Amino acid sequence: MKKSFLFAMMLCCAQLLSAQQERIDLSGTWRFQADPMGFGKTPGSELYQAKLTESIMLPGSTDEGGKGMLTTARYVDRLTRKFEYCGQAWYQREVIIPEEWKDKEITLNLERCHWETTVYVDGKEIGAKEHLSVPNRFLLSKQMTPGMHILTICVDNRLKYPMDQWNHGTTEYTQTNWNGIVGKIELTAYEKTNIHALKAYPDIETRTVTLDITVNNTTGQPTNGLLQLVINEKGGKTVSEQSFPITLKEGSNQLIKEISMGKNIKLWNEFTPYLYEVKAMLTADNKQDSKNITFGMREVTQGKHHIQINGRNVHLRGALDCCVFPLTGYPSTTIEDWKRIFLTVNDYGMNHIRFHSWCPPEAAFHAADEVGIYLQAELPMWIKDVGQYPARRDFFEKEMYAILEEYGNHPSFILMCNGNENEGNFNVLEDLVKKAQKHDNRRLYSASTARTHTPSDQYYVSHVTEKGWITVYEGKPSTDWDRKKESDIDCPVIAHETGQRCMYPNFAEMEKYTGVVSPRNFEVFRERLARNGMLHQADDFFRATGAHTVLQYKEVNESLLRTANSGGFQLLGLADFPGQGSAFVGILDAFWESKGLVSPEKYRESCAPTVLLARMPKRTYMNNETFTAKLEIYHYGEHPLKRGKLNWELKDGKGNTVKKGNISTPAIPCATVDSLGKVNISLNKVSHAEKLTLHTTLNDTYHNEWDIWVYPCQQTAADDYVYARTYDEKVKTALQQGKKVLLIPENVKGRKTKFASHFWNPHKNTCSFSYLAYASWCRAYIFPIHSLYRVYYDNIRHHVSYAV
């Protein structure tokens, strides 16, 4: 016990020393010089040898610093940057290296640069890096001797390779093509014998973790040392404590250690996101170096139809993150910001985020580890000519390896894909998958999100398989359908970018845009309304179309929950996508905040680990028919459900019961879609046209409901109305006589309509999709004050129909 205590204290002291003396934080005011024409590297104009005269704050971007061109444009297809800058930008400051750092290895860490970054020390070039997804690191041991030095960094945000315009690593349409360094900026000193890398490979079957440790020895000669390893439950008790004598050759040394985690391991998953900490300390030549990581005891495997976490099928209820950060124009590098997003995702019943054609900073992985969110990261790849440009191919391969090295320990990182809807030479993409699988087996890999299924795919995200469409964009008049046949292929399939139903913008949101982008697209849309004399109806239009989108997403989600062999879905979106034509497709705004359209509790009725489902052959009935519904349960909760009781009740618009009953339910295992029973209800007591609602509740805990519409089978014509299908002489005469005419034309010129609202948005690809032959609308807004609607509403003043 005493030995354990002393060892822990020694390790703690070593870490404190590291934190206090071996890092220099370089955040703050830097000198700055714009260089959009790129002259700063040419002979005679060397900015890296000059003292820059302007100033800027780092971490940050040129947009935040007010550098570049002040814009006046008003883009309707995206948010507009207030300041646009493209090209080389120079950042400079003095740094003082302490005497204690003499003879140490010194690294410059630049987190989240955009894009190519070249470093100079005292006017001499050190090198360039081009990572978009991981920190750019530069070894400065020879240059950063004790004393003062001038550190100059050139960041160039011009596209280095042909990247197309859409990928979310470089696009203007979401995060913007900013210039700067927006994460940690620091110098770090290490001993010449140091722990360079530490990876954890958990094995839940043997209850062990294999630690892969890379130790660098730059002393110029072999040496001996002591490696001490401590594994703790994060914030809790010690699990293992070991030390090993080691012999190190000059250069890089790989050490493999398998460590028992004990009998009572805590597994990581969405319900129990337990984490462990590894603290490694190396003592060599009477000097110490340490490195810490966190990991989870979790295993990801490919099941027949589902991704499996720790041997159990999971169903991914996911949403997309397309790198939308309206205040900064770039992704956050703080854990708390990401926890807020992931907790919101969890509040709405989801367990998964796909990072669409980009990879987030490490803070996102840490936050997902803690919250219990399954992540899919991607390369910044969305291209139509895969295989072209060898330099670009090399960039993607290096970026892939860098992502795996940087974020591979995180248990939330369960999926990796090359990118979005790629086209071209898929042999190149499959080669990347094979290399990734060989390099790191701690997650599953796929060649491309959509377009082509390759033999190496361990899962497949797509609109369609060889057996048909799996993505669902809208509901149907029936709910007695699913995508089971279409999902039955040789690996788990996840429905790609479901939903995408457009709603009207919420102009009240405009005041939130206090950062680097301006909502000038909102301004244009608002002015159009004003010109047409409808600005006073803007909020009504937003709420009407928003209610309709909520209704459609209920249908979309439930259709894939009914699909027992579905691997999951990725909704587009839970939050708005303000680019590519201004796609207001989210029930949350671009800030991941509620629009006030639906509460998390209500949304979870149709999107949660446990959801009640109803298979109905239709939704409209005559009152001489019998309403039927087959009731099911989707259960991917943490624990099996005990035997219980399902209560059902059909109510009218006043809350009166048409009929009710209950069904005894069996025990429900986890990871299943099971039948619960059937209801048959005669509708002969319904005397007039009205909407009825079927309410279901299981064990007083889980609730869901569905609307149906019932009409009288005996049609009666009002005496004071003339009913007509064409405008003819009979109609004219009736009107001249002062009679009322109900005209329902048979043939109307114009485009067809359907229940679903506009796909994505009306401004992008308006001729690209066959179903856009239908009218481009976001649904109807109806005041039910006409006598036609009186049968539906008792109190006209207090009812507004937001969706027909």
Label each residue range with its predicted role.
Residues 1-7, 11-12, 17-356, 399, ...:
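Secreted/periplasmic carbohydrate-active enzymes, especially glycoside hydrolases
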Residues 23-25, 101, 144-145, 308-309, ...:
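Extracellular/periplasmic catalytic domains that process cell-envelope and extracellular macromolecules
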Residues 31, 114, 158, 423, ...:
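Short, solvent-exposed loop/turn segments at secondary-structure junctions
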Residues 129, 372-379, 741-745:
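Short hydrophobic/aromatic-enriched beta-strand-loop microsegments
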Residues 342-343, 352-588:
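Substrate-binding/catalytic cleft of secreted carbohydrate-active enzymes
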Residues 720-763, 780:
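Short alpha-beta junction capping motif
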Residues 749-804:
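An acidic, glycine-rich "communication" segment
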